[in-house]
Amino acid sequence: QKDVSNQIQSILEKSIPLDPNYTLKGELLGFYAQLEGLSRNTSQPNETALVSGQLTWNAPWGSVFGSGGYLRHAMNGAVVDTDIGYPFSLSLDRNREGMQSWQLGVNYRLTPQFTLTFAPIVTRGYDVRIEGTGILGGMNYRVSEGPLQGMNFFLAADKGREKRDGSTLGDRLNYWDVKMSIQYDFMLK
């Protein structure tokens, strides 16, 4: 085979019960990739490392979380996908050269089926320094009874602002990104 990527990933998780209804959960992700063969590029790094973690406090009403991530070298996503860290945004770059991303958020459960999410994010890094801020808002509803039991509706809106000196779209980007998904899980017996 003339095109190979060697990849290793590890996830460590630990949950600590604080009370019958409260837990603290820590997650740490480590990832390393190295390109061999046709994917190697003389003008770009042929290896990268990613470290990312999240700390979540779970309560009966929802959860509060904080996460962070760091990517050493950006790589072509068709060769190696490094967009796997815990800080989440629909569109803000978290996957560039020397990039850091930090996020704090809350998930609030209005009912057992309906959850709201609010999660600001901050990013820094890249060859041409990108400084981004964003706010992710989301709603999730899961149908719990009737013929559509198991159907899940998800709607998220991301408000992003980035400072990218020299960007073809301008030095300051100010945008909305909206995503909706409908998922229906079922089992054949």
Tell me what each language-model feature is.
Residues 119, 131-144, 150-154:
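A C-terminal functional module that forms or caps the active site or interfaces directly
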Residues 82-86, 132-134, 169-177:
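Flexible, surface-exposed loop regions and adjacent strand-edge segments
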Residues 39-43, 165-170:
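Flexible, solvent-exposed loop segments that connect beta-strands
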Residues 137-143, 172-189:
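Outer-membrane beta-barrel "beta-signal"
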